[in-house]
């Protein structure tokens, strides 16, 4: 059956409702689920459906949800506070074990200097992540949040992935929900979606066994959304996963989004094997065709996600422009600083002026946004 026939009657979901406030405990469905895509249809999108038709359908879904031609971006930076990690992920070239001569950990003041540097360049978001360092006390993290909020009120502290939050809890002898409560009290309101990789038990056991199964990531975001946090959902594909694993990932985050509507965007990117333990088996990362297929399929399958991000940094600027015609409505960030992909021998840089130019060249109107997708300026 042709793709157009398969999805002729599909309609984009209504816009997501607001995420619940901190005291809301009941589920808050965010989409009309009666006519959403099935796993079989998702499998078709990710395998044998003609790529350009998948892209065209995804573009229709994008404009059904957001009729204007605005493409947003955020001015941000992505520094790291430590490369010390005890998790030994097979895909990571960035980490060093405790005691390694190349291991480092920044002081609170050194991290805040990076936040200040980003703020002086106009950043409104700092995405701060690091390794799982058992030597760092909980107060280190809470101080970073409080000081960022106090000293740089224009900057959103988009700090600490789910696995880092689990590490904080283990070191402090607390529950991860206690950590979420303390981060909230310190002033944090958003959480990055990194560390999801592919939410498949088989895949995570192969590439990141010490991180636990999919639930270890999902439970943090579930409880964060219950408390009123917003977060992103990411996916790093192109290593040991199958199409069924990708669909497991889609199903898991779609189901969680039905509960609270706390995800602001879906952000996929391809694995970069350079300098990693997986490099011996995976010599080359996936190309643009696979990226565009995954992106477009996500726009169609994740009917309750308000935004899909074009990962220019990992996939290249030209692919980022094409992604805007395959369902993406957000360009991502400036990433003034980024070290994880750099460690895998993959480097890409961009300026605000270049972002504006690239979005316009693709036929869209650029608009600067906040972490939570509020428009600050239209160009």
How should each PLM-predicted stretch be described?
Residues 141-153, 174-186, 242-260, 292, ...:
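Short, electropositive alpha-helical surface patch
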